[in-house]
Amino acid sequence: MDKQYVVALDQGTTSSRAIVFDRDANLVAVSQREFTQIYPKGGWVEHDPMEIWASQSSTLIEVLARAGIHSDEVAAIGITNQRETTIIWDKLTGKPVCNAIVWQCRRSAAICEALKAQGLEPLFRDKTGLLLDPYFSGTKIKWILDNVPGVRERADAGELLFGTVDTWLVWKLTEGKVHVTDPTNASRTLMYNIHSGEWDSELLKALDIPASLLPEVKSSQAVYGTTRIAGEGTEIPVAGMAGDQQAALFGQLCVEPGMAKNTYGTGCFLLMNTGKQAVKSEHGLLTTIAVGDDGGISYALEGAVFMGGATIQWLRDELGLIRDASDTEYFASKVDDTNGVYLVPAFVGLGAPYWDPDARGTLVGLTRGANRNHIIRAALESIAYQSRDLLDAMSKDSGVALKQLKVDGGAVANDFLMQFQADISGVEVLRPAQTETTAMGAAFLGGLAVGFWSNVDEIRHKSGIDRRFVPLMDDKERATLYLGWQDAVRRSLSS
């Protein structure tokens, strides 16, 4: 039967999803299953790897049924995933040695501090482009080896395997035949040298992690193995893989240097493709790996804002100022400006470019005339201001003045926010017609790997624009407003 579809598996932090795309990159069907969030202690976050697999495999079966298609019509299954989340399992039984340690989990903070005290942060920064932070996989692995009884001995004996979620899914899909990851996921582990494209023995020694745990690193645009849906039917290639933010970058076809996208979710993730040059940031950004137009390694600068959509949730859940996130556009548009009010949502500290974990939220500029609408508008504007901070840092690091910003994520439906983002940044904001850009990135990678699409040029026109938001604010007003934001941020910083 003619293969007319590609399936993307989108394994996220709170749910597993499967999406079917046709040859024109139209979304045909979606299936989604949430799974349990486990919080054993303050600052600890876990997932059950078997529940991740159960939720993801069931969505795969379900989405084909919803689309009304058979497995022999599927050209490839591509994968995108929550990055950094760490799983270790027995290579013979497939049983995890403990729950997955999620990217949000802070339990390995003491390990990071010990490595910093040894003066090792510059080494890790130079080789991986990352900071020594519990966010990344390497110190999570070390924590498991040091704290779960018997695991280090089993690891040293070669009995165990490590993987981020992509690796775990491929291993399960191929029934334990394939232990593999891609460069985008490997680059988030603190163990992968982004310049040589290899696991780094010096970093492994510093972390005391045996190399036998690690998966083979293959191209993001490769065929890794095959799978049968529910153990039946045609063998489908498992092909194409990238971490969620890099998949979104590719789904937005930001494959050339200077192209950037911002994902507006709980937080915001802004990535700029820097081509074949790994740009070392001097302004608080991470250097990471992206997927090039040939499927090979490109580099990117990445900045993360901790509180994006979560700021709007705070307005709703803690302050009761709105009933639904969509209400913000209505209330913000009822006033001409914020009446001098700025909200800095540093509720869990500030991420890039400040990296101040002890910064705290501030609401400044309040006068007797300030009302609910001004505060709601200030909350929305804070998302755009924080993104402007990242854009400015990227321009300084890369030497490229951005002209366009591609956007995705739930908050891009808010026209007020998108227009203010364009205004305060002085760049054109492009909202795609297809908002499932992360899944589309995985689908594109899978389809390209098996020849479903021949090259990036063939898929370029399949990614249309819903609306262009052009800057309408004059330079003087933009500068004045941004100075006010910078002053508000200074008040929120810990020192």
From Swiss-Prot:
Pfam families: FGGY_C, FGGY_N. Glycerol binds at residues 83-84, 135, 244-245. One of its GO terms (molecular function) is glycerol kinase activity. It catalyses: glycerol + ATP = sn-glycerol 3-phosphate + ADP + H(+). Sn-glycerol 3-phosphate binds at residues 13, 83-84, 135, 244. Its EC number is 2.7.1.30. Inhibited by fructose 1,6-bisphosphate (FBP). GO terms for biological process: glycerol catabolic process; glycerol metabolic process; glycerol-3-phosphate metabolic process. Pathway: Polyol metabolism; glycerol degradation via glycerol kinase pathway; sn-glycerol 3-phosphate from glycerol: step 1/1. It comes from the Bacteria. ATP binds at residues 13-15, 266, 309, 313, 410. One of its GO terms (cellular component) is cytosol. Keywords: ATP-binding, Glycerol metabolism, Kinase, Nucleotide-binding, Transferase. ADP binds at residues 13, 17, 266, 309, 410, 414. Key enzyme in the regulation of glycerol uptake and metabolism. Catalyzes the phosphorylation of glycerol to yield sn-glycerol 3-phosphate. Belongs to the FGGY kinase family. HAMAP family: Glycerol_kin. This is Glycerol kinase. The lineage of its organism: Bacteria, Pseudomonadati, Pseudomonadota, Gammaproteobacteria, Alteromonadales.
